[in-house]
A protein has these predicted regions:
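Intrinsically disordered, low-complexity regions
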Residues: 7-9, 43
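Positions in alpha-helical segments
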Residues: 9, 34-37
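Short basic helix-loop element that most often maps to the first helix and adjoining turn
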Residues: 9-24, 28
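Short, basic-rich loop-to-helix N-cap that marks the start of a DNA-contacting helix
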Residues: 27, 42-47
Length: 47
């Protein structure tokens, strides 16, 4: 089974280490900031 919470924590750690806001990361990967939020919280899987 996929560990969505673990993946979300790694995404957030990488984002903050690169000093990116959710908004900026969302712009870079062409998704909404809310989608980034849901990934970081383990609520959604990346596709």
């Amino acid at each position: 089974m996929i560990d969505l919470i673990g993946i979300g924590k790694r995404v957030k750690t990488a984002r903050t280490e690169h000093k990116l806001t959710r908004e900026k990361l969302a712009e870079i990967v062409n998704v909404t900031p809310h989608y980034i939020y849901e990934i970081e919280r383990g609520m959604k899987a990346m596709s």
